[in-house]
């Protein structure tokens, strides 16, 4: 069980997961600089709470974003979604992010504060007006200490930006709240004789059940991708990554994922038309895999979590059905507590499959459904149910599998449709209750 120290919404990274999942180095896209500082939102007086990304390349970047479906959308969500729609994804060249305060359900003052964060950032960076998107995360219902933020933006923008690994890690740390480690991923891929780089960061440990939860993130690339293509790629990749994870079943007021492409690495422009279809497919595959890697880190850092669980549903009639079934299991509190207790109570899995809201009566046929625990160490799977018939389960073997930190659960619906989906979740523990019971104390 990990130890977490919380002062309102700041943390000390004391989990062993920090040493395992925080990269010691990375590769980063050309033409971007990032950084983070403490500006005075978090009350401990030192935790980083303001982050900034800037496009340094001489041309306007392409941008796309997806936002929370929660009806109580936070002020930064409302302002940023309106802005990116008005600009049609062209000329978004920076992102300003604060942590420690969500600026959600804060009325007209909250809207003004979000707009002022954009205004000051654009002014300091000498951007054209409305070239910045804003994100916030933290406690809901409190007004921002806006004077601290507005005075911190020049300090951050003029003195604390850079493109080193340390700058990227500082930026990732500055957006954390109850996270026990900053989430940062980078990679390179080849296309059309050019080497392109992806870098991304995310925050989130609780209130995670997206259709888009308190989940913030952005990833950037130096590949030349049009706004239209980037928007299509982002929606596809988020559906299979950030919208396929769950920690606690809550969807927050602030969820935002932003993608920016500045084209600094050169090469032919990638659009979503027939002439660049092959290149589009490559970029979509790379970004989707990248987004999945980043999203999985959020689950691994689930508040109080001790297990990382991949629920793989196969042979469904459709991808939608497969995902609905996987999501139903992933969000079952009874299933998640059984995983924490290392209890092979597969009846809870079947129960969640059975009440999932799939599209037709033929989507789930009990006599065709099979369930297995699959160890991630390569050893033999443990079959629990085959075509609706229960197996005699070796409880010692089941307990041994469930002691592992990582676990795959395979659900074969046996419909003949051949469609599959993955959904990533974690267990539900005593510590989750402790963290969230003390969140504002």
Curated annotation (Swiss-Prot):
The keyword Mitochondrion applies. The alpha and beta chains are autoproteolytically processed from a single precursor protein within the mitochondrion. It is an enzyme of class 2 (transferase). Pathway: Amino-acid biosynthesis; L-arginine biosynthesis; L-ornithine and N-acetyl-L-glutamate from L-glutamate and N(2)-acetyl-L-ornithine (cyclic): step 1/1; Amino-acid biosynthesis; L-arginine biosynthesis; N(2)-acetyl-L-ornithine from L-glutamate: step 1/4. The active site is at residue 214. The record marks 137-138 as: Involved in the stabilization of negative charge on the oxyanion by the formation of the oxyanion hole. GO terms for biological process: L-arginine biosynthetic process; ornithine biosynthetic process. Substrate binds at residues 177, 203, 214, 303, 436, 441. It is found in: Mitochondrion matrix. It catalyses: N(2)-acetyl-L-ornithine + L-glutamate = N-acetyl-L-glutamate + L-ornithine; L-glutamate + acetyl-CoA = N-acetyl-L-glutamate + CoA + H(+). InterPro entries: Arg_biosynth_ArgJ, ArgJ-like_dom_sf, ArgJ_beta_C. One of its GO terms (cellular component) is mitochondrial matrix. Keywords: Acyltransferase, Amino-acid biosynthesis, Arginine biosynthesis, Autocatalytic cleavage, Mitochondrion, Multifunctional enzyme, Transferase. The record marks 213-214 as: Cleavage. It comes from the Eukaryota. Belongs to the ArgJ family. PANTHER family: ARGININE BIOSYNTHESIS BIFUNCTIONAL PROTEIN ARGJ (PTHR23100), ARGININE BIOSYNTHESIS BIFUNCTIONAL PROTEIN ARGJ, MITOCHONDRIAL (PTHR23100:SF0). NCBIfam families: ArgJ, PRK05388.1. Catalyzes two activities which are involved in the cyclic version of arginine biosynthesis: the synthesis of acetylglutamate from glutamate and acetyl-CoA, and of ornithine by transacetylation between acetylornithine and glutamate. This protein may be expected to contain an N-terminal transit peptide but none has been predicted. Heterodimer of an alpha and a beta chain. This is Arginine biosynthesis bifunctional protein ArgJ, mitochondrial.
């Amino acid at each position: 069980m990990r130890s977490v120290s919380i002062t309102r919404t700041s943390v000390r990274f004391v989990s062993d997961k920090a040493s395992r999942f925080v990269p010691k180095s990375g590769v980063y896209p050309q033409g971007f600089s990032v950084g983070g500082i403490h500006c005075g939102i978090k009350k401990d007086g030192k935790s980083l709470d303001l982050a900034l990304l800037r496009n340094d390349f001489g041309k306007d970047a392409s941008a796309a974003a997806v936002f929370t479906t929660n009806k109580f959308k936070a002020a930064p969500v409302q302002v940023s979604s309106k802005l990116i729609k008005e600009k049609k994804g062209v000329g978004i060249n920076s992102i300003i992010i604060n942590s420690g305060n969500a600026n959600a359900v804060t009325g007209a003052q909250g809207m003004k504060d979000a707009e002022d964060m954009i205004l000051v950032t654009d002014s300091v960076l000498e951007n054209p007006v409305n070239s910045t998107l804003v994100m916030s995360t933290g406690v809901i219902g409190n007004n921002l200490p806006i004077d601290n933020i507005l005075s911190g933006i020049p300090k951050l923008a003029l003195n604390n930006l850079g493109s080193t690994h340390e700058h990227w890690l500082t930026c990732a740390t500055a957006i954390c709240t109850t996270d026990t480690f900053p989430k940062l991923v980078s990679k390179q891929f080849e296309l059309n004789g050019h080497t392109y780089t992806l870098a991304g960061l995310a925050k989130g440990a609780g209130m995670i059940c997206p259709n888009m939860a308190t989940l913030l993130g952005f990833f950037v690339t130096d590949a030349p991708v049009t706004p239209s293509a980037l928007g299509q790629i982002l929606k596809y990749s988020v559906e299979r990554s950030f919208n396929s994870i769950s920690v606690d079943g809550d969807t927050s007021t602030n969820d935002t994922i932003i993608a920016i492409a500045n084209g600094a690495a050169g090469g032919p422009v990638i659009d979503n038309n027939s002439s660049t279809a092959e290149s589009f497919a490559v970029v979509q595959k790379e970004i989707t895999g990248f987004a999945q890697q980043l999203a999985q880190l959020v689950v691994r850092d689930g508040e109080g979590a001790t297990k990382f669980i991949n629920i793989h549903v196969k042979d469904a009639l459709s991808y939608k059905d497969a995902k609905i079934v996987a999501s139903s299991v992933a969000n079952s509190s009874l299933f998640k507590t059984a995983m924490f207790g290392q209890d092979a109570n597969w009846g809870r899995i079947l129960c969640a499959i059975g009440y999932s809201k799939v599209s037709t009566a033929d989507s789930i046929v009990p006599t065709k459904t099979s369930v297995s625990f699959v160890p991630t160490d390569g050893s033999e799977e443990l079959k629990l149910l085959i075509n609706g018939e229960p197996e005699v389960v070796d409880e010692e073997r089941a307990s041994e599998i469930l002691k592992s930190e990582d676990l795959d659960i395979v659900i074969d619906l046996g419909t003949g449709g051949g469609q599959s989906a993955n959904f990533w979740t974690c267990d539900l523990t005593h510590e989750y209750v402790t963290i969230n019971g003390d969140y504002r104390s």
